[in-house]
UniProtKB/Swiss-Prot annotation:
Its main location: mitochondrion. DNA-dependent RNA polymerase catalyzes the transcription of DNA into RNA using the four ribonucleoside triphosphates as substrates. One of its GO terms (molecular function) is DNA-directed RNA polymerase activity. It catalyses: RNA(n) + a ribonucleoside 5'-triphosphate = RNA(n+1) + diphosphate. InterPro entries: DNA-dir_Rpol_C_phage-type (IPR046950), DNA-dir_Rpol_phage-type (IPR002092), DNA/RNA_pol_sf (IPR043502). This is Probable DNA-directed RNA polymerase. It is found in: Mitochondrion. It comes from Agaricus bitorquis. Keywords: DNA-directed RNA polymerase, Mitochondrion, Nucleotidyltransferase, Plasmid, Transcription, Transferase.
């Protein structure tokens, strides 16, 4: 019996025949179980006990004793005693039955074995019946008592109400000396009417309709079903059979009695150990994934053994020879031999088993979460960096003979000197050992362009679904303890065990650099305090939502999962297109499966989500499964923990608006969204009678985030059912076109600001429709198309959905080719009489007929859109021209482009060129010549110009978040951000909105404004690298030199005669410093208007 419960021990005192009762009922059923089996086994009658009846009897006894009712317990104890007594009787006695005849009436024969068995097991049936009868008698008696008590209470309540009504009647009669004829019945009716109105006033929030009692009953029924934990546990148990061994071990740790800190440390060590011994952990089980591993391990082990065999012979004689040869070579000629030696030493020190396990595990992880691409070069370099970190775990005494030959500290020192080519050698050797000896990881030529052909690495389609589920490492798990604070010198070790951080993060760095940037971003105190606060926010899993999701996950016809809740087997006969579709679908299955598995694991634990920062200051959670920056499914499962949020009036309003937003009404005025809520709820309740997903299925075109909609719907229903309920769901409001909001603020262009809801002078903004910049841009594009010289273009009207992606990338230097690619996501290509055409669907044309464009005319369409988006928005054009002029100067002077963000980060934007180089890692005979790209000291001018604007705008976005978190920390609000989206509990959203606005205002409109500060910084940087030049007038050309001065140039930013001379150039090149955009001519007046308009805007976020 595996039932876990409080136990009551009953032992039989055979001498006195008494039952001894203690505090453990499990021992009672244990003793009965063992006694019955002992009786049966000791019997000479071959009694076979019916285990099904025994289990039924024991479960019934446990369930009855759970009630802790003395009267019932006494009855059960006596029944148990009778059962044991009677069973023992059948075992210890020889029994007979009469077989007499007329001649021999007294003849008897002993019972058969069948008869002994039947009577013995019949005792168990009698015991079950007796206990059930006792339970029924008790329940009947208890029910009679309940009825009496309820009737008594009802009489008391009725008398109290009548007494209260009499008092109310007297008060009403005395008001203003009016004579009112009342009786008790009318007063009762009036009181009920008042109560009903008060109740409905709460329920409807800001709506204008009421809910019936049937609605309320239905709401309670929905919530009750969602909160049935036994159903949730059953679904999780079903899911757990598919989990990896790693997740099962983590579950055991989470379910243990360890303190929180020890649990976290145990999980960290378990995951790291699992990665280092991946194969050993998975060799002996029978799951499909592990059968694959079992089959390939011998091949990999043989390959490693053969590689190292020559080096191990005669006490490492070959290594000794290599060391000797290298020591006699000059620095310039020993590099390849040194790298080859390092590769061998790394494998020897780490060991074959750990090298196989860790490299295989990391390759699967890199290919599953391919942020830096899947070229062989990228995978090899990343793998090289990761395997080197494992050396930190190697102790000096682990391999004394090898350490005596080549000390590990000396090896680490040599590794620290390696460039990307050396790191590539290490990673490529390990990758080559796997690709050459198994077909799980395969290579394919991705771009076939002669010498520039590049190998891509991927998981074989046959194995991808079975292997990627295992690719979970420690940084993808939530933390049970609050992440460690960033130290005073900027070191970041969020995990309890420092080695965990070193192995998986960036050597204790908060800011993750970018491979093509020469310089690292310098952090600031504000960044540190912001990250420390964000890391301190505690979360928990939304169990009701998890219950819903698990049920939907098992539904093969789920419209919400769109088929991604089932693995699609990839067949040899599948076409390339079908295989790609299946691989993509299975990838989403793996993502969803991991999210659900981890949510199930952590459902009973509060947790934290540590973050890291990219070079621009943008914040990202380390976990990409349980993450508030994840997709719809992940965000729907997260609640704030440690928050007491009983909805107040502002909370009700924000919850209602967010529900309306998720239902697809986010383009309506704020006030109209509030009126939609009751209708949404009533329609949902009606649909729920058919299916709990029918409402979403019927409104799938409007609801883009169905899981979050369900999550917020349940929160709303809970608040209706229980006004005192704690509603800790994150309410997420996002900025509209935040990149363009930053451009409007930088340039102080009021029209643009108004079109992105940054600014409004409305007297009642809640009644206004939110501005839609996409529609604004679409109208400008349509004006150009209708006046086109090309007949086909005049029939094209496009729509908001088609141009949205292109408009979103306006602040990020959209190209004409980029626009063409974005548009093709909505168009098709057809061949007619050997000519290929782009087909514009009838839904995007005035005539409602398909329009066929040849590629020349399609190019004209793209050109018109590009012209409108880049040239007809004056502020964007002015700002782009200004930055391009500044970048030209920095490039000409060969100095890095630097800026200090409003939150104090110092960013050096130095995109460098890479040169291709052919490399063959000679450690393996099977290694191939591969072209890798190595960094140079030269700046990549084209890349810098193209990518400066998006990275600059993102750094401002990030600063807004840093300033917000800094101010939020003083108010101790629960909060998270998704770059330009902001979340808190419903009651705190208006406070958060104000703080977001204040942070934005502090960036652009306090003191002299950020663009002027940035301009001065640019000028100071330029002046420090040049000689000042003073001119008596305007310079017509570079030869018009009036004189140089050694005095520092005092730059006057609003004048147009500021020049410097390039001190490095052989000819005295004169450089004009560009002016600020035009909006700054009336800066002070514009700033005051902007601040007032921002504070007045209802849709800045929301």
């Amino acid at each position: 019996n595996s039932i876990v419960r409080k136990r009551i021990e009953i032992s039989t005192n055979e001498n006195r025949g008494q039952l001894v009762v203690s505090s453990d009922k499990y021992s009672l059923v244990d003793n009965l179980f063992y006694n019955l089996h002992d009786y049966a086994s000791q019997s000479k009658h071959n009694i076979i006990i019916d285990d099904g009846k025994v289990e039924k009897l024991l479960n019934l006894i446990c369930n009855v004793l759970d009630r802790n009712v003395n009267e019932l317990n006494d009855s059960v104890f006596l029944i148990i005693k009778d059962i044991e007594k009677e069973c023992k009787y059948y075992v210890s006695n020889v029994l007979y039955r009469s077989v007499g005849s007329r001649k021999n009436r007294g003849r008897e024969v002993e019972w058969s074995s069948y008869k002994y068995n039947k009577e013995f097991n019949k005792v168990l049936d009698k015991g079950i019946i007796s206990i059930n009868n006792e339970v029924l008698k008790f329940i009947s008696k208890e029910r009679e008592g309940y009825i009496e008590r309820v009737e008594s209470i009802a009489v008391t309540v009725k008398n109290k109400i009548l007494e209260l009504n009499n008092n109310i009647a007297e008060v009403l009669l005395s008001i203003k000396n009016k004579v009112i004829v009342l009786n008790k019945e009318s007063v009762v009716a009036k009181v009920e009417e008042i109560n009903y109105e008060v109740h409905n006033k709460f329920i409807k929030g800001n709506g204008n309709t009421n809910f019936s009692n049937r609605n309320l009953t239905e709401i309670k029924s929905i919530l009750k079903e969602l909160n049935k934990m036994e159903i949730l546990d059953n679904r999780i148990n079903k899911l757990s059979t598919k989990e990896s061994d790693l997740l099962k071990v983590i579950k055991e740790i989470l379910d243990s009695n360890l303190i929180i800190e020890d649990k976290q440390l145990a999980i960290e060590k378990t995951v790291v150990e699992y990665e280092l011994t991946f194969f050993r952990h998975n060799m002996d089980t029978h799951e499909t994934r592990n059968k694959i591993i079992h089959n390939i391990y011998p091949k990999l082990n043989k390959a490693y053994t053969e590689l190292l065999a020559n080096y191990k012979l005669n006490r490492y004689s070959k290594i000794k020879k290599s060391i000797h040869l290298i020591s006699n070579k000059s620095e310039g000629t020993k590099s390849k031999e040194m790298i080859k030696l390092i590769v061998v030493l790394v494998i020897l020190y780490i060991g074959i088993d750990k090298c196989i396990s860790y490299s295989f595990y990391q390759i699967i992880n890199l290919l599953t979460n391919a942020r830096d691409g899947t070229s062989r070069t990228n995978i090899a370099i990343n793998l090289g960096f990761r395997i080197i970190k494992v050396l930190k775990y190697i102790k000096l005494d682990e391999n004394p003979s090898l350490n005596a030959l080549y000390p590990i500290n000396k090896l680490k020192d040599e590794i620290s000197k390696l460039d990307n080519e050396g790191i590539y050698w290490i990673g490529d050797t390990l990758l080559g050992l796997i690709t050459a000896n198994c077909d799980i990881v395969v290579e394919e030529l991705k771009w076939n362009s002669g010498k520039d052909s590049q190998l891509e690495v991927r998981i074989n389609d046959k194995f991808i679904s079975n292997l990627t589920v295992s690719g979970i490492n420690i940084v993808q798990l939530p933390m049970l303890t609050e992440p460690r604070k960033i130290s005073s010198d900027g070191l970041y070790f969020p995990y309890i065990n420092s080695d965990t951080t070193n192995l998986h993060l960036f050597e204790g760095e908060l800011i993750k650099g970018k491979y093509n940037l020469r310089d690292h971003t310098e952090a600031s105190e504000m960044l540190y305090s912001s990250i420390n606060y964000l890391n301190s926010i505690k979360f928990k899993i939304n169990k009701a939502m998890l219950n819903f999701i698990l049920a939907e996950w098992d539904n093969k016809d789920s419209k919400l999962f769109k088929g991604y809740n089932m693995l699609k087997p990839i067949l040899e006969t599948d076409s390339k297109e079908i295989k790609e579709e299946k691989v993509s679908s299975n990838s989403k299955y793996t993502l969803y499966s991991n999210i659900i598995s981890l949510a199930s694991l952590y459902k009973d634990n509060e947790f934290y989500l540590p973050v890291y920062v990219d070079f621009r200051g943008r914040v990202y959670p380390l976990s990409n499964y349980i993450s508030y920056q994840g997709g719809d499914l992940a965000r729907s499962l997260i609640l704030f923990a440690d928050t007491k949020c009983v909805l107040n009036n502002s909370g009700k309003e924000c919850l209602n608006v967010y529900l309306a937003n998720l239902a697809g009404y986010d383009k309506l005025p704020w006030s109209e969204r509030l009126t939609k809520v009751d209708g949404i709820i009533k329609e949902y309740l009606e649909s729920n009678e058919i299916s709990n997903t029918k409402y979403i299925e019927d409104n799938i075109d409007k609801i883009s985030e169905p899981f979050q909609f369900i999550s917020i719907m349940y929160a709303k229903l809970l608040s209706i059912s229980n006004p005192k309920a704690n509603i800790s769901n994150p309410i997420l409001f996002d900025a509209s076109c935040s990149g363009i909001q930053h451009i409007a603020a930088l340039t102080l262009e009021k029209e643009l600001a108004s079109n992105v809801n940054l600014y409004t002078d409305s007297s009642n903004p809640k009644e206004d429709y939110p501005q839609d910049f996409y529609t604004y841009a679409l109208e400008k594009i349509r004006d150009k198309l209708i006046n086109s010289d090309i007949t086909e273009l005049r029939d094209i009207k496009l729509n908001r959905k088609i141009i949205k992606r292109s408009v979103m990338t306006i602040p990020y230097n959209i190209s004409m080719a980029g626009i063409g690619e974005h548009l093709m996501e909505h168009f098709t290509v057809k061949t007619v009489l050997k000519y290929r055409y782009v087909v514009i669907p009838g839904s995007a044309t005035i005539s409602s007929k398909d329009v066929y464009l040849d590629y020349s005319k399609y190019g004209q369409l793209c050109k018109i859109i590009y012209f409108v988006l880049t040239k007809e928005l004056p502020s964007l054009r002015l700002l782009s021209n200004y930055f391009e002029s500044m970048i030209d100067i920095f490039v000409k002077l060969n100095i890095p482009i630097t800026w200090v963000t409003p939150s104090g980060l110092k960013i050096k934007y130095t995109n460098i060129k890479f040169k291709p180089q052919k490399v063959k890692t000679s450690v393996l005979n099977t290694s191939k010549i591969t072209t890798i790209k190595l960094p140079t000291d030269s700046l990549d001018v084209l890349s810098t110009k193209r990518s400066f604007m998006p990275n600059f705008i993102h750094s401002l976005d990030a600063s807004n978040v840093h300033l917000l978190l800094n101010s939020v920390s003083y108010k101790n609000l629960p909060v998270y951000t998704v770059h330009d989206c902001f979340a808190s509990t419903a009651n705190n959203m208006f406070k958060l909105e104000k703080l977001v606005k204040n942070a934005f205002i502090n960036i652009y409109f306090n003191d002299e404004g950020y663009l002027l500060k940035l301009h001065k910084h640019f000028v100071d940087t330029i002046i420090s690298a040049t000689d000042p030049y003073l001119s008596n007038g305007n310079i017509e050309n570079e030869n018009d030199i009036k004189g140089l001065t050694t005095e520092r140039l005092e730059y006057k930013p609003l004048l147009s005669s500021n020049y410097v001379a390039d001190r490095i150039s052989t000819k005295a090149d004169i450089i004009k410093i560009p002016d600020l955009p035009a909006g700054y001519k009336n800066k002070n007046k514009n700033i005051n208007e902007f601040v007032k308009g921002i504070l007045n805007s209802k849709y800045f976020i929301g």
